[in-house]
Design a protein with these regions (language model features):
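C-terminal engagement/docking regions of AAA+ P-loop ATPases
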Residues: 2-11, 15, 247-332
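Walker A/P-loop
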Residues: 46-84
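Conserved AAA+ P-loop NTPase core
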Residues: 80-112, 168-177
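Canonical AAA+ ATPase core
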Residues: 99-104, 125, 129, 137-230, ...
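P-loop (Walker A) phosphate-binding loop of NTP-binding proteins
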Residues: 58, 92, 160
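Walker B catalytic acidic pair
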Residues: 57, 120-121, 132
Length: 332
């Protein structure tokens, strides 16, 4: 491992996490133009245990490119799975196949056995196949013919879906949505960003990008260990809880966010603090992630089911109205 890569867990510090995060984002931005805020939120999830990500946006907005670029910059193995109605659980988990040469069955591991999995158009797969992915996301293992096999560490699922296509899709069940740490929209580039995309492609003279690995699997694990040391004041913890609980009392919400939503806020806020070279969380860290961490966990009242923005409006309202703690002093 070269000197720029993250040190092992015994030596890594908050400053190491911040410096490495900057290098990772710079590397990803060699392929992805703009969208720095989205990229940093995705990195915060990648540096959090259980940081699965749902990208919901229109085709052609670099969702696949983002996932692939992060895998390269993080030095992690990457597999893309195109979800379709005829995709079977065994197609993603693998199974035992008969080897005629050896006269015995041997294990053929499926594409789930990688560090970063791009589950493209996840809502096009059948519920049975979705449930196989859910087990992997939840347990970090798969079961084949009664045998339990551990998945690589780290294991991160980046799933995509189109927000307007419903024909021929199987909406993700609430249990699976709740397993995603955050849900993000990439958004269209600005005019200048779109022109920059064209300029880079013209000068590169090919579609492919060449990105280097800033760290590796051991480095990501070391960064996660450092993030676990970030201090969270009890008042800030209470703020996370009150934001989450407020979703259950809102007039437009039928079912609010589970405690897993508060845990997502905790993990993401700590990761962001470390990326900002802080060893403590501030309320603004929580506010930053509230929409992405909570919106997809809400089940709205039936009259709002067709309003795609309603859940986000609820969270934005709660961010404005729930009392924000004032910290007397920070950890240092």
């Amino acid at each position: 491992m070269n000197e720029e890569r993250v040190m092992d867990g015994r030596e890594a510090t908050i400053s190491d996490v911040a410096a490495s995060s900057q290098r990772i984002i710079r590397e990803v931005e060699r392929a992805v133009v703009g969208k720095t805020e989205v990229l940093r939120k995705i990195l915060a999830a990648c540096l959090s245990t259980g940081g699965h990500i749902l990208l919901e946006d229109y085709p052609g907005l670099a969702k696949t490119l983002i996932a692939n670029s992060f895998a390269r910059a993080l030095g992690l193995s990457f597999k893309r799975i195109q979800f379709t109605p005829d995709l079977l659980p065994g197609d993603i988990t693998g199974g035992y196949v008969y080897d005629r040469a050896e006269g015995a069955f041997r294990l053929r591991k499926g594409p789930l056995f990688a560090n970063i999995i791009l589950a493209d158009e996840i809502n096009r797969a059948s519920p049975k196949t979705q449930s196989a992915l859910l087990e992997a996301m939840q347990e970090y293992q798969v079961t084949l013919e009664g045998e339990t096999l551990k998945l690589p560490d780290p294991f991160i699922v980046v799933a995509t879906q189109n927000p307007i296509e419903y024909e021929g899709t199987f909406p993700l069940p609430e249990a699976q949505l709740d397993r995603f740490m955050l849900k993000l929209a990439v958004g269209y580039p600005s005019g200048d960003e779109e022109q920059e995309i064209l300029r880079r492609r013209r000068e590169r003279r090919q579609d492919e990008f060449s990105l280097r690995a800033v760290t590796d699997a051991a480095g990501v694990i070391a960064m996660r260990q450092v993030i676990e040391t970030v201090h969270v004041d009890s008042d800030v913890e209470r703020y996370m809880v009150e934001l989450t609980r407020a979703t259950r009392r809102h007039r437009h919400v039928s079912v609010g966010a589970s405690p897993r939503g508060a845990l997502a806020l905790l993990k993401l806020s700590r990761a962001w603090a470390a990326m900002e070279s802080r060893d403590y969380v501030v309320p603004d860290d929580v506010k930053r992630f509230a929409p992405a961490a909570l919106t997809h966990r809400l089940i709205l009242e039936p009259d709002l089911w067709t309003d795609r923005r309603a859940a986000g409006d609820v969270i934005n309202e709660l961010v404005r109205t729930v009392t924000v703690p004032v910290l007397q002093e920070t950890a240092g």
